[in-house]
Amino acid sequence: VDASHWYDDLTLVTKKWRGWMAFDSRAEKPVLGPKAVRRYFARAMRDIKTWSRERMGGIPALLGEYGIPFDMNGARAYSSGDYSLQEEALAANYDAVDESLIDTTIWNYTAGNRHDRGDLWNGEDLSIFCRDDYDSGRSETGDPLDRGGRALRGFVRPYAMATAGEILEMRFDTRRAVFTLRYRPDHAIAAPTEIYVPEVQYPTGFSYEVQGGEGEVKRGRLFVTAGLGAGEVLVRISRD
């Protein structure tokens, strides 16, 4: 498995989120404009898949590390409790993950993360969990199980956990909380497609539409079964 790492270098090094600017380290030039930045993120992740396929014998590609510094902008969020910038930065990364359809593991979860010392590694503070926030009882959702979690809305998103076929498109509109999945079903697979639908994005519930199949909600997940002979299945989930 090619477990390459990728980071938004400008944000990682400067510890500031600029949604309108990035630095393309391969081309060694700046990327300007919000749309251009997001296109660059997705292209960089697709390049990892292309490299694995064309230069490494077609082995699977896994984005083994990516993430953002939570102590950005002078660690203001630690005193204000406002992680909206971190949410925005994470969402931009996850939008690129969805667009490129690459498998990923975020960096990182550190059980002992503290505001004053970060992850205790290389001066980094990239953990999605903070012990100080946990000890203070801080929960972004009000649920005790979410105590200590940071910028949850940036990375706790709907996604296809298991797909009975080939994903053609997956995206999540963070502002409107609309999730779209389009896939080509493999009718030899008896199991349904399973989509994770997190309550943090749909606190008042959700509605769904399936074209080319039917759905069923169980335990906060949407299970989709393709219709007999369907060539494509389109799923849309929206907030109630």
Language model segments and positions:
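Conserved, mostly hydrophobic/aromatic
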Residues: D2, E65
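Low-complexity "stalk/linker" and mucin-like segments enriched in Ser/Thr/Pro/Ala/Gly
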Residues: G212-R219
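Short, well-ordered coil/turn segments that N-cap beta-strands
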Residues: G57-P60, S100-I102
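A short, acidic, amphipathic alpha-helical segment used as a generic capping/interface helix at domain edges
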Residues: A44-T50
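Extracellular low-complexity, Gly/Ser/Thr-rich intrinsically disordered linkers
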Residues: G57, Y66-P69, A96
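Surface-exposed interaction regions enriched in Ser/Thr/Asp/Glu
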Residues: F223-D240
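Aromatic-rich peripheral "rim/lid" segments of glycoside hydrolase catalytic domains that contact
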Residues: A3, Y7-T14, R18-V31, K35-A44, ...
